[in-house]
Amino acid sequence: MHRDILFLLKHDFPDGPGAAYYCPECAQLNGVLACYPQLRHVLDVRYVDFPRPRAEILSLIGEANQSCPVLIIADGPPAHVRDVELPTVNGLHFVAGATAIGNYLSQVHGVGRPH
């Protein structure tokens, strides 16, 4: 991997009868990407389907960590990153959840941070 990979759920997914759904945390990060379009040049943003298993994520960080949003760190986290949980699976560090990912992106790429 050369760039960090940000996995987000595709919007308008079915989950039973009724209207389609979207993932609120993924929508939040789509907003961050809209506010800071330069992030799309430094991240590999991938949209995955809602149903599990999510094979692409599973192959990298295992079945237990296939929730979205998740950011897979390409070359290990920079030493200056603070107050962000960075678990490791299969030798890969990752960040889970919109707020944690937002804090990581702020520290690493100099964009605004979640309030």
Locate the predicted segments by residue.
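GST-like domain detector, emphasizing the conserved glutathione-binding G-site
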Residues: 1-115
